[in-house]
Amino acid sequence: FYNVGKMPDQDIAELARSKNIDIAIDLTGYTRNSRPGIFACRAAPVQVSYLGYPGSMGANFVDYIIADHTLIPEQSQKFYSEKIVYMPHCYQVSDNSRPFPEADLSRAELGLPEAGFVFCCFNHNYKITPREFDIWMRLLSRVEGSVLWLRRSNEWAEVNLKKEAETRGLDPGRLVFAEKCDYSEYLMRISKADLFLDTFHYNAGAIANDALWCGLPV
Protein backbone atom coordinates (compact mmCIF):
# COMPACT_ATOMS: atom_id res chain seq x y z
CA PHE A 1 0.00 0.00 0.00
CA TYR A 2 1.28 3.44 -0.95
CA ASN A 3 -0.28 6.64 0.36
CA VAL A 4 -0.02 8.89 -2.68
CA GLY A 5 -2.69 11.43 -1.76
CA LYS A 6 -0.27 14.36 -1.66
CA MET A 7 1.84 13.34 -4.65
CA PRO A 8 1.50 15.02 -8.08
CA ASP A 9 -0.31 13.09 -10.80
CA GLN A 10 2.85 12.57 -12.85
CA ASP A 11 4.75 11.12 -9.88
CA ILE A 12 1.91 8.73 -9.06
CA ALA A 13 1.79 7.50 -12.65
CA GLU A 14 5.56 7.00 -12.67
CA LEU A 15 5.35 5.05 -9.39
CA ALA A 16 2.64 2.80 -10.83
CA ARG A 17 4.72 2.11 -13.94
CA SER A 18 7.80 1.37 -11.82
CA LYS A 19 5.77 -1.30 -9.99
CA ASN A 20 4.79 -2.86 -13.33
CA ILE A 21 1.09 -2.32 -12.79
CA ASP A 22 -0.73 -3.98 -15.70
CA ILE A 23 -4.22 -2.51 -15.31
CA ALA A 24 -5.22 0.76 -13.64
CA ILE A 25 -8.89 1.24 -12.75
CA ASP A 26 -10.42 4.68 -12.30
CA LEU A 27 -13.33 4.54 -9.82
CA THR A 28 -14.24 8.24 -9.83
CA GLY A 29 -14.01 9.63 -13.38
CA TYR A 30 -14.93 13.31 -13.35
CA THR A 31 -16.64 13.29 -9.94
CA ARG A 32 -15.55 15.19 -6.85
CA ASN A 33 -11.94 14.69 -5.67
CA SER A 34 -11.10 12.63 -8.75
CA ARG A 35 -7.58 12.44 -10.21
CA PRO A 36 -7.95 11.87 -13.98
CA GLY A 37 -4.52 13.43 -14.47
CA ILE A 38 -2.96 10.23 -13.13
CA PHE A 39 -4.51 8.30 -15.99
CA ALA A 40 -3.63 11.03 -18.49
CA CYS A 41 0.00 10.33 -17.52
CA ARG A 42 -0.54 6.60 -18.24
CA ALA A 43 -0.26 4.82 -14.92
CA ALA A 44 -0.61 1.44 -16.68
CA PRO A 45 -0.67 -0.05 -20.19
CA VAL A 46 -4.40 -0.77 -19.82
CA GLN A 47 -6.65 1.79 -18.13
CA VAL A 48 -10.29 1.14 -17.24
CA SER A 49 -13.19 3.28 -16.02
CA TYR A 50 -15.55 1.57 -13.59
CA LEU A 51 -18.37 2.17 -11.12
CA GLY A 52 -18.21 5.77 -9.94
CA TYR A 53 -18.68 7.59 -13.25
CA PRO A 54 -20.90 5.80 -15.77
CA GLY A 55 -20.47 8.39 -18.52
CA SER A 56 -17.71 8.45 -21.10
CA MET A 57 -14.44 10.09 -20.11
CA GLY A 58 -14.10 11.19 -23.73
CA ALA A 59 -10.35 10.73 -23.43
CA ASN A 60 -7.86 8.63 -25.36
CA PHE A 61 -6.13 7.56 -22.15
CA VAL A 62 -9.10 5.48 -20.93
CA ASP A 63 -9.21 2.24 -22.90
CA TYR A 64 -12.25 0.43 -21.49
CA ILE A 65 -15.37 1.01 -19.42
CA ILE A 66 -17.10 -1.80 -17.51
CA ALA A 67 -20.88 -1.71 -17.90
CA ASP A 68 -24.03 -3.72 -18.48
CA HIS A 69 -26.77 -3.39 -21.09
CA THR A 70 -28.97 -1.35 -18.78
CA LEU A 71 -26.23 1.16 -18.02
CA ILE A 72 -25.12 1.49 -21.65
CA PRO A 73 -27.72 0.16 -24.10
CA GLU A 74 -26.59 -0.53 -27.64
CA GLN A 75 -28.04 2.72 -28.97
CA SER A 76 -25.82 4.67 -26.55
CA GLN A 77 -22.54 3.02 -27.52
CA LYS A 78 -21.81 5.79 -30.04
CA PHE A 79 -21.46 8.29 -27.20
CA TYR A 80 -18.50 6.45 -25.65
CA SER A 81 -14.87 6.80 -26.66
CA GLU A 82 -13.96 3.74 -24.57
CA LYS A 83 -14.35 0.12 -25.61
CA ILE A 84 -17.26 -1.25 -23.60
CA VAL A 85 -16.82 -4.42 -21.57
CA TYR A 86 -20.28 -5.80 -20.82
CA MET A 87 -20.98 -7.82 -17.70
CA PRO A 88 -23.58 -10.57 -18.29
CA HIS A 89 -26.03 -9.26 -15.68
CA CYS A 90 -25.23 -6.23 -13.50
CA TYR A 91 -22.00 -4.24 -13.68
CA GLN A 92 -22.05 -3.47 -9.96
CA VAL A 93 -20.47 -6.03 -7.68
CA SER A 94 -22.76 -6.71 -4.72
CA ASP A 95 -22.29 -9.01 -1.77
CA ASN A 96 -23.90 -9.95 1.53
CA SER A 97 -20.75 -9.70 3.63
CA ARG A 98 -21.32 -6.12 4.79
CA PRO A 99 -22.40 -6.12 8.44
CA PHE A 100 -25.75 -4.46 9.02
CA PRO A 101 -25.30 -1.54 11.44
CA GLU A 102 -25.99 -2.40 15.07
CA ALA A 103 -26.70 1.19 16.13
CA ASP A 104 -30.37 2.01 15.81
CA LEU A 105 -31.74 5.54 15.96
CA SER A 106 -35.41 6.33 16.36
CA ARG A 107 -37.35 8.16 13.68
CA ALA A 108 -37.49 11.19 15.96
CA GLU A 109 -33.69 11.17 16.31
CA LEU A 110 -33.45 11.18 12.53
CA GLY A 111 -35.81 14.13 12.22
CA LEU A 112 -38.69 12.00 10.94
CA PRO A 113 -42.27 11.91 12.23
CA GLU A 114 -43.10 8.97 14.48
CA ALA A 115 -45.84 7.87 12.08
CA GLY A 116 -46.39 8.30 8.37
CA PHE A 117 -44.97 6.95 5.13
CA VAL A 118 -41.36 7.97 4.37
CA PHE A 119 -40.38 8.53 0.76
CA CYS A 120 -36.66 9.10 0.31
CA CYS A 121 -34.09 10.06 -2.30
CA PHE A 122 -30.48 10.22 -1.17
CA ASN A 123 -29.12 11.18 -4.58
CA HIS A 124 -27.29 14.49 -4.88
CA ASN A 125 -29.79 17.34 -5.04
CA TYR A 126 -28.49 18.44 -8.45
CA LYS A 127 -30.02 15.28 -9.94
CA ILE A 128 -33.54 16.45 -9.07
CA THR A 129 -35.42 18.05 -11.96
CA PRO A 130 -38.89 19.68 -11.99
CA ARG A 131 -40.34 16.58 -13.65
CA GLU A 132 -39.72 14.18 -10.78
CA PHE A 133 -40.19 16.86 -8.13
CA ASP A 134 -43.72 17.46 -9.44
CA ILE A 135 -44.43 13.73 -9.13
CA TRP A 136 -42.99 13.60 -5.63
CA MET A 137 -45.12 16.52 -4.50
CA ARG A 138 -48.23 14.84 -5.89
CA LEU A 139 -47.32 11.74 -3.91
CA LEU A 140 -47.02 13.77 -0.72
CA SER A 141 -50.36 15.44 -1.37
CA ARG A 142 -52.09 12.09 -1.83
CA VAL A 143 -50.43 10.15 1.01
CA GLU A 144 -51.54 11.79 4.23
CA GLY A 145 -48.81 12.30 6.81
CA SER A 146 -46.03 11.27 4.43
CA VAL A 147 -42.65 13.02 4.19
CA LEU A 148 -39.89 13.22 1.61
CA TRP A 149 -36.45 12.49 3.07
CA LEU A 150 -33.62 14.04 1.07
CA ARG A 151 -29.87 14.37 1.25
CA ARG A 152 -28.61 17.75 2.47
CA SER A 153 -26.22 18.70 -0.33
CA ASN A 154 -26.08 22.45 0.33
CA GLU A 155 -28.16 25.19 1.94
CA TRP A 156 -29.23 26.74 -1.37
CA ALA A 157 -30.72 23.51 -2.68
CA GLU A 158 -32.59 23.00 0.59
CA VAL A 159 -34.04 26.54 0.52
CA ASN A 160 -35.05 26.26 -3.14
CA LEU A 161 -36.63 22.82 -2.82
CA LYS A 162 -38.67 23.92 0.19
CA LYS A 163 -39.76 26.99 -1.74
CA GLU A 164 -40.81 24.81 -4.69
CA ALA A 165 -42.80 22.56 -2.36
CA GLU A 166 -44.61 25.59 -0.96
CA THR A 167 -45.47 26.89 -4.44
CA ARG A 168 -47.11 23.51 -5.06
CA GLY A 169 -49.31 23.95 -2.00
CA LEU A 170 -47.37 21.73 0.39
CA ASP A 171 -45.96 22.41 3.83
CA PRO A 172 -42.17 22.72 3.29
CA GLY A 173 -41.74 20.99 6.65
CA ARG A 174 -42.67 17.74 4.92
CA LEU A 175 -39.26 17.82 3.27
CA VAL A 176 -36.70 16.41 5.70
CA PHE A 177 -32.99 16.82 4.98
CA ALA A 178 -30.42 14.32 6.28
CA GLU A 179 -26.99 15.46 7.38
CA LYS A 180 -23.83 13.76 6.14
CA CYS A 181 -22.91 10.75 8.27
CA ASP A 182 -20.60 7.74 8.30
CA TYR A 183 -21.32 4.68 6.18
CA SER A 184 -22.74 2.55 8.97
CA GLU A 185 -25.29 5.17 10.00
CA TYR A 186 -26.08 5.82 6.34
CA LEU A 187 -27.13 2.17 5.88
CA MET A 188 -29.17 2.32 9.06
CA ARG A 189 -30.92 5.45 7.79
CA ILE A 190 -31.85 3.81 4.53
CA SER A 191 -33.58 0.99 6.39
CA LYS A 192 -35.87 3.53 8.10
CA ALA A 193 -37.46 4.71 4.84
CA ASP A 194 -40.40 3.00 3.13
CA LEU A 195 -39.71 3.69 -0.56
CA PHE A 196 -36.71 5.04 -2.48
CA LEU A 197 -37.63 7.44 -5.29
CA ASP A 198 -35.01 7.59 -8.03
CA THR A 199 -34.29 10.50 -10.35
CA PHE A 200 -34.97 10.07 -14.07
CA HIS A 201 -32.14 11.70 -16.00
CA TYR A 202 -29.26 10.86 -13.68
CA ASN A 203 -30.16 7.70 -11.81
CA ALA A 204 -28.87 6.38 -8.52
CA GLY A 205 -26.03 3.89 -8.80
CA ALA A 206 -24.35 2.60 -5.65
CA ILE A 207 -27.03 4.29 -3.52
CA ALA A 208 -29.79 2.27 -5.21
CA ASN A 209 -27.68 -0.84 -4.68
CA ASP A 210 -27.37 0.00 -0.97
CA ALA A 211 -31.11 0.61 -0.70
CA LEU A 212 -31.96 -2.77 -2.20
CA TRP A 213 -29.39 -4.47 0.03
CA CYS A 214 -31.09 -2.90 3.08
CA GLY A 215 -34.46 -4.19 1.92
CA LEU A 216 -35.76 -0.82 0.73
CA PRO A 217 -37.77 -0.97 -2.52
CA VAL A 218 -36.62 1.36 -5.30
Label each PLM-derived region with a short phrase.
Residues F1-F61, H69-Q77, W149-V218:
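Conserved nucleotide-cofactor-binding alpha/beta core module
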Residues V46, D63, K83, A115-V118:
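A generic secondary-structure signal marking the coil-to-beta-strand transition
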Residues D63-Q75, Y80-D95:
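Donor nucleotide-sugar binding/catalytic pocket of nucleotide-sugar-dependent glycosyltransferases
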Residues H89-D182, R189:
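Conserved catalytic-core segment of nucleotide-activated headgroup transferases in glycan assembly
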